[in-house]
Curated annotation (Swiss-Prot):
Keywords: Transferase. GO terms for molecular function: formyl-CoA transferase activity. Involved in the catabolism of oxalate and in the adapatation to low pH via the induction of the oxalate-dependent acid tolerance response (ATR). Catalyzes the transfer of the CoA moiety from formyl-CoA to oxalate. Pfam families: CoA_transf_3 (PF02515). This is Formyl-CoA:oxalate CoA-transferase. CoA binds at residues 17-18, 38, 72-75, 96-98, 104, 136-139. Its EC number is 2.8.3.16. Homodimer. NCBIfam families: oxalate_frc, PRK05398.1. The keyword Cell wall biogenesis/degradation does not apply. The gene is frc. It catalyses: formyl-CoA + oxalate = oxalyl-CoA + formate. One of its GO terms (biological process) is oxalate catabolic process. It comes from Bradyrhizobium sp. (strain ORS 278). Substrate binds at residues 247-249.
Amino acid sequence: MTKALEGVRILDFTHVQSGPTCTQLLAWFGADVIKVERPGVGDITRGQLQDIPNVDSLYFTMLNHNKRSITLDTKNPKGKEVLTELIKKCDVLVENFGPGVLDRMGFPWEKIQAINPKMIVASIKGFGPGPYEDCKVYENVAQCTGGAASTTGFRDGLPLVTGAQIGDSGTGLHLALGIVTALYQRTHTGRGQRVTAAMQDGVLNLCRVKLRDQQRLDHGPLKEYSQFGEGVPFGDAVPRAGNDSGGGQPGRILKCKGWETDPNAYIYFITQAPVWEKICDVIGEPTWKTDPNYAKPAARLPRLNEIFGRIEQWTMTKTKFEAMDILNEFDIPCGPILSMKEIAEDESLRKTGTLVEVDHPTRGKYLSVGNPIKLSDSPADVTRSPLLGEHTDEILRQVLGFSDHQVAEIHDSGALDPPRKEAAE
């Protein structure tokens, strides 16, 4: 069975997380992703957060599946020649360098277009054009500047960043969609184009409900927020709302049986209006179904602390899974707080390919995420990440068509290997 992106070749100049997330997704869909790495060094994450000495870290392996690796010194004249040939043979160049790095390498957009007019150049930057476009950005910086941190946490506490990598991985996923869109448009125009995704923009896109609420504030308090029921006035900016639901339906994280010793013995519970009467029956408060203080959503808003306190009395008598089973029978929206250990041990996620076990030649077997997007006609097979420069000669011969003599000549030039240390006299 062919893959969705089979025949698409991607020149991958990305590193760390945002760019590799993008190119890995495209590789899972069948694109031939050629990861260009510095000789002797490679992607910096190969050596970051290592759990096993002298072995590629999980940080690297889990972001670079299904790719091929070529080492190339782009400052070397022969290296520049090889890069020029790669540009001719590839459909997309993806990079997440700092601003201006491609230009300083000697390959600005105009030159790339002259070499290959069909080439799509896709870039991730921290900020879009403006006063901050030259600033260095990492995951937590993106969360802070994109509106996530200011709206995450509790009202009386500090802004918080999330555990999910919405700045890095989130922007990488945005860029992947942009690349596929540009590839489709190219089938009509025959031309390549630039595709850009700024991390600030990506985070803001994921925080759109908070931008929604910012505008709603102009017309009155946000009644579904806990502070409304507590009588706390709103300021002029969207507040941090703890674990309140962002969809307009009141929700909270509640304790379950065992919470005293298990830091994840909790469940998220939403008091959705259509199932309110079922909620009343489950928790043993049938009179609330007709009591004017509780029967209607508007009447419940000032009493959310009391209501969730009563629901929590019930959830504390059940494990999070027992509570979920009972609530699901009545179509009451809820979800257990799952630890990473629980997720890693969930066999159902392995059966769907959401979690995959990968065998690596130097670190052995490890667990990774698989493709979160499932295509019925293009199943994603997750293969291991490449060793540094593992496919260098293969790419030179098979992709660029170089002869053995040419490959040897390129090696002799030093374009593919780390600089040789001079022997001490």
